Each structure stands twice: as structure tokens, then as C-alpha cells.
Amino acid sequence: MLLAPPSTPSRGRTPSAVERLEADKAKYVKTHQVIARRQEPALRGSPGPLTPHPCNELGPPASPRTPRPVRRGSGRRLPRPDSLIFYRQKRDCKASVNKENAKGQGLVRRLFLGAPRDAAPSSPASTERPAASGGWAAPQDAPEAAGKRALCPTCSLPLSEKERFFNYCGLERALVEVLGAERFSPQSWGADASPQAGTSPPPGSGDASDWTSSDRGVDSPGGAGGGGGSEAAGSARDRRPPVSVVERNARVIQWLYGCQRARGPPRESEV
């Protein structure tokens, strides 16, 4: 029966690899300092206290010199490429932004101020006009402004079907000839136009009672003798406010609807 060594039952475990290396250290280590020193096991949670041991225990000339140049070189050389890249990117971005802003400002100037070539010939022309004509500069510009303000469709181009339909209120040509084309002219729609004796009021103008009263004043002997009735009617007509466009259009629509109902056959109520 084999007996176990006296150390094993007291410890109750097998020697670890560190202990075995410590026992055989004299075989592969030649320095007496390393043989006399016992290596402690590495602690995972605290790497700080382990770092100074190799630096202090190794040779004094080699330990301080080796880490310093590596740290200095790594601290100075690593940020250089990144900083250069960042600097170049910022510089390129600023240059591109400045170019785009310059292009945008030039475009805005061309849109709002116009091209310099177009503005150059206009300035001497404007300076030559008062020098040559003197006080007659305003009469020369007046016809151009008047032509731009008032564009007469009858003078420029012949009336199309839509324009004719709008001007004659959608009526047929035969009915317009019967009623009189002069009643549809723009002058007949004004409130200041005085009616002639024996004429019916145009559609959209004042009430028929005003026209009949003025006609009666003219035809009556008192009106023919002194003219007081016509003057009173004229003053009353002047005091009346002019007819608005909305009211005139409403009267025209009502008049057209009445004409359509008069021309068509009578309708029977379905109620």
C-alpha cells in the first residue's frame, strides 16, 4: 500500500503551476535576484499596482528610457493625421460655401438689379433726354405711359367670340341689332351719361322712374318754359351715388333672365 507524502494531506490539494515553476526556477533562471524573488499571482481587478513592479525591478537604465520615447512619439504623431484631415475638410467646406454664396449673390443681383449691359445704355439715354429737350421731357413720356395704362382691345386685335359674348351680355346678334348696339358700349354704362329724350334706359343703369320723370320734366310745359324741372332732376341725379360694378352685373343678369322668360313659352308649375 502506497503512502502519500506528508505535505499532501496537510494541504489537501495538488501544487499549482506557479508553485512548480518556483520549485524549478533554478533550472532556467540565471540571475540571483530573480531566483530570490517570488512572483505573486496576477490580480485581474487591479492592474495599477502591477505596473510599477516590472519598472522598478528591471534594470534602472532600460526601464525609464524605453517607455518614454514610445509615449512621446505616440502622443505627438497620432493626432497629426486626424488634425490635418479635419483642417483640410473645414477649409474645403468653407471654400465651397463661399463659392456658393458668391454665385447666389450674383444671381440675386442679376434678377433684381438686371444685367449691367442692359442698365448701361438706359442711363445715357435718360441723361440725354433732358439735355436735348429740356422742359419737354414730360410730354414725351406721357404717350408711352398712356399706351401702357389703357390697352384698348378694339384697336389692337379684332374681338373674339368670347369677348363679343361678354360685351353683348351673351345675346344673339339679331337681338342686339333690335335693341341697339350703342346701348352696349362702355359709355352707356356710366352713371354720368345723360339720357336722351324718348329713349329707354339701358340695362344695369338707374331705375326707369328717374328716366321717366326726367322725360316728363322736359316734355311738360313748365319744364320747356323755365327748365326748372330739368335742373332739379339733373341735380338729384348728380347727388345719387354711382352704381357699383356688382350691382350693375346683378341688374344685367336680372334683365337677361326677364328677356329669356318673355321670349320662351309660359311654364306650368309642377306643384
Swiss-Prot record:
Residues 220-231 have a biased composition (Gly residues). Residues 1-83, 116-145, 186-245 are annotated as: Disordered. It comes from the Eukaryota. Residues 116-126 have a biased composition (Low complexity). Residues 68-78 have a biased composition (Basic residues). Coiled coil: none annotated. InterPro entries: FAM110, FAM110_C, FAM110_N. Belongs to the FAM110 family. PANTHER family: AGAP005440-PA, PROTEIN FAM110D. This is Protein FAM110D. It comes from Homo sapiens.
